């Protein structure tokens, strides 16, 4: 297994996902921040003293999840978004499409009460955080994007293959 996605944390939990795992399911695991020692769950176990919840499938390949309030949002490389209840692992919504045939390698960012998810084809999906899947806007730049965005001073910085963009109000 090659761990590509970065861990994220909220509510005393640290969320880990597998990244590249040749021909195997990609798990997502919620580890208690205070856990120590060997906390590996047994084969069919979903919880241990150190693991709050674990799913054998649903982890991202490259992107890092993002945690906002009570929810964990996981964009998958094939252009879908899944939302979990962060503390329990309960699926809120699953594999909601972000366009058709999109590839996502950049990690999402959040700002001003919105989640920004960019595709390699230059589309930026603006999603409302919360239990209902809602795309607020889709913006398109004519460039390839693989790098994660940065947010600073009310501006969104996007590095494309050829240009650096700064988008603000």
Predicted regions and their residues:
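Noncatalytic, solvent-exposed loop/strand surfaces
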Residues: 1-169
